Curated annotation (Swiss-Prot):
It is an enzyme of class 1 (oxidoreductase). SUPFAM superfamilies: FAD-binding/transporter-associated domain-like. PANTHER family: BINDING OXIDOREDUCTASE, PUTATIVE (AFU_ORTHOLOGUE AFUA_1G17690)-RELATED, FAD-BINDING PCMH-TYPE DOMAIN-CONTAINING PROTEIN-RELATED. The keyword Flavoprotein applies. FAD-linked oxidoreductase; part of the gene cluster that mediates the biosynthesis of virensols and trichoxide, fungal natural products that contain or are derived from a salicylaldehyde core. The pathway begins with the synthesis of the reduced chain in virensol C by the highly reducing polyketide synthase virA via condensation of one acetate and 8 malonate units. VirA has interesting programming rules since the first 2 ketides are fully reduced, the 3 following ketides undergo beta-dehydration, and the last 3 ketides are only reduced to beta-hydroxys to yield the trihydroxy portion. The keyword Oxidoreductase applies. This is FAD-linked oxidoreductase virF. It comes from the Eukaryota. It comes from Hypocrea virens (strain Gv29-8 / FGSC 10586). Its cofactor is FAD.
Length: 451
């Protein structure tokens, strides 16, 4: 179509169509195409299948799996300009295109009187996050982001446009809900949204503790919040404080309800008498008010992530990991933009959905551990130390995660894990059958690929 454009290396258009959040383990491209229509996407897919050249779909450029490094000298299928956003107030639905990021839904949805469960930073593609599951602070109330999904339009490996839902291609729908990157190019997605509660206001409390009080804080979390309210969520971050030249622990709590209820829920934390701040913000401002989104969302940075699901909160495990990251900060000053993140999220609504109903394998988790390594481009020594420590910490945290083997959320996976650890042993046979049926040529083979 006239709206489809092709670009080549060393041009501004090409750079825009291949920009990534992380420059670690990069895929490489010989050309980029911005398709103007679903039909043109189908033509690209058909050419890729018949001519046997690789392509990689791009929404917001936030994919960071090391497995993407296996993609070399291919085509970027850039959908970042597909920014359709439609709210149907009567049906209480939101429809978005693959280029729409979380940042772009907050204000329109809030102004329309709705909200939805989202991720914890603003820059990824909403659809990209969804098809791996989509976790976040509201999953105790409303489930995973994919649990809000009602239907998608997708160009499949055969080049044809399909509407996929619980009643249209239900077998493929099952696979999209947890392993969606393996089956086609999603061009739009429709979600169920919820009317705002508490006038759309949420209570936020931030706590900051010096290194010597880390264990005390971890004990409070394990003892009081292992079965937290569905309205409550916390993200803990261990980071280097450049002002004090030491490690600090921060806890960002969000409560979806009145301040009085929030303060009652958080009484054990307030009783620590730690440095703290509180505020009431609109739902649409939660991420921007947390203070780390702008830094996290900077593109074109060397980053490497290692992660693990947690079924239990272990103060012993948290403290052991905290001490290792503290040593890393002192031994490797070039890595002091690194963060160790513990996401403590309730899972009532996630666990209420039958495990067999979707491909997603981890409905029993209550949170996630992430080590987000960051260093300066060219600092190979810090990069190597980060990779080594990331694997060590992942193995160490696995012993106190509550799982019998490593369980890793696909959107957080590093890319070196076994597919059993990512997709779950019991889900893989059915996923493998779906892959053979819907993508027999294995065109979608780079982002945590199925066998």
């Amino acid at each position: 179509s006239l709206n489809t454009t092709v670009s080549f290396p060393n041009s501004p258009a090409f750079n825009a169509s291949t920009e990534r959040w992380t420059i670690a383990d990069p895929p490489t491209y010989i050309a980029a195409i911005r398709p103007g229509t679903e039909e043109d996407i189908g033509k690209v897919i058909n050419l890729a299948r018949t001519k046997r050249f690789p392509f990689l779909t791009r929404g917001a450029g936030h994919g960071y799996s090391a497995s993407l490094g296996a993609f070399q000298h291919g085509l970027s299928l850039d959908l970042s300009q597909w920014k359709t956003l439609k709210i149907d107030k009567k049906a209480q639905t939101l429809t978005v295109g693959p280029g729409v990021t979380f940042a772009e839904i907050f204000d329109p949805l809030f102004k329309a009187g709705f909200y939805i469960q989202t991720g914890s930073c603003s820059c990824p593609s909403m659809i990209g996050v969804t098809i791996g599951g989509g976790i976040g602070r509201l999953m105790g109330k409303y489930g995973l982001l994919m649990d809000a999904l009602q239907s998608v339009r997708m160009v499949g490996a055969g080049g044809k446009v399909m509407r996929v839902s619980a009643t249209s291609h239900p077998d493929l729908w099952w696979g999209i809900l947890g392993a969606g990157a393996n089956f086609g190019v999603i061009t739009s997605a429709t979600y169920k949204v919820h009317p705002l509660v508490n006038n759309g206001n949420v209570f936020i409390a931030d706590f900051y503790l010096p290194v010597e009080r880390s264990r005390e804080y971890f004990d409070i979390v394990e003892a009081n919040y292992s079965n937290m309210s569905a309205n409550l969520a916390q993200i803990m971050v261990a980071s280097w404080n450049r002002t004090t030249s030491s490690v600090q622990l921060g806890g960002n709590w969000v409560y979806y309800g009145p301040e009085k209820e929030a303060r009652k829920e958080l009484a054990p934390v307030f009783n620590l008498n730690a440095t703290s701040s509180t505020r009431i913000v609109r739902w649409s401002e939660i991420i921007s008010s947390a203070g780390f989104d702008e830094f996290i969302c900077q593109p074109n940075q060397p980053r490497s992530l290692f992660s693990l699901n947690q079924k239990i909160y272990s103060a012993d495990g948290y403290q052991a990991g905290f001490e290792k990251i503290e040593k890393y900060f002192y031994d490797h000053p070039g890595g002091r933009d690194t963060t160790l993140v513990f996401e403590n999220f309730p899972n009532q609504a996630v666990a209420a959905i039958p495990d067999a109903s979707t491909a997603f394998p981890w409905r029993d988790f209550k949170g996630f551990i992430q080590i987000n390594f960051a260093w300066t481009a060219g600092d190979d020594a810090t990069a190597q130390a980060s990779n080594k420590l990331g694997k060590e910490l992942r193995n160490q945290f696995a012993t106190t995660s509550g799982y019998s083997e490593k369980a890793i959320f696909v959107n957080y996976a590093h890319g070196d894990e076994s597919i059993e650890n990512i997709y779950g042993r019991r889900k893989l046979p059915r996923l493998a059958q779906l892959k053979k049926k819907y993508d027999p040529s294995n065109l979608f083979a780079y982002n945590h690929p199925l066998p």
